[in-house]
Amino acid sequence: LGDVYKRQTLYFAQRPDGGEMQALMEEAERDLKAIRSAAGRITDVRTHEDALALTETGDRLYCYLREHPEKISSANRFLIYYLDTVGRILGQYVNFQDAGLGTSEVREFQRKVRAILPKLKTGFEEQLSQLMASERFDAEADMKVMEGLLNTEGFQWEANQNGSV
């Protein structure tokens, strides 16, 4: 983690907007802590598990951005809007839960939160996949080159659909 921190700090120092980017990452870290805290306090088992799964995905995305600070600008909406909004929504869910409110409006709000958590997790995963697309394309290009070299040397190498050779 020390090398990641040094790399990120150096990257920020070299950019005119580095201070803003650093502040954005610090805010994202606070938002993730708020989401994690709220998720830990949710008593409904399924909602708790879904909120924790969302937190884990958010953490992976955040860690990826720390390791690849050059991609932070590509994740602005995730960092600025989604993390903050999810933190506030889960915080309100916990507030209603802890207050023991059972009005139809509160139950409907909680139902909507339960319904949206898996969708948010999918969205976070898609964001991470998009950020990692260039690495995936590079690896696929490397595999094509390697396959071509193996074929020219007389080896038949082609991956099947299930990944076996």
Name every feature range the model reports, one short phrase each.
Residues 1-5:
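Short, small-residue-biased leader/transition segments that mark boundaries at the very start
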Residues 7-9:
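Internal, Lys/Arg-enriched amphipathic helical interaction segments that engage polyanionic partners
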Residues 11-62:
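Non-transmembrane accessory domains of multi-pass membrane transporters/channels
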Residues 49-63, 69-165:
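Soluble C-terminal extramembrane regulatory/interaction domains of multi-pass membrane proteins
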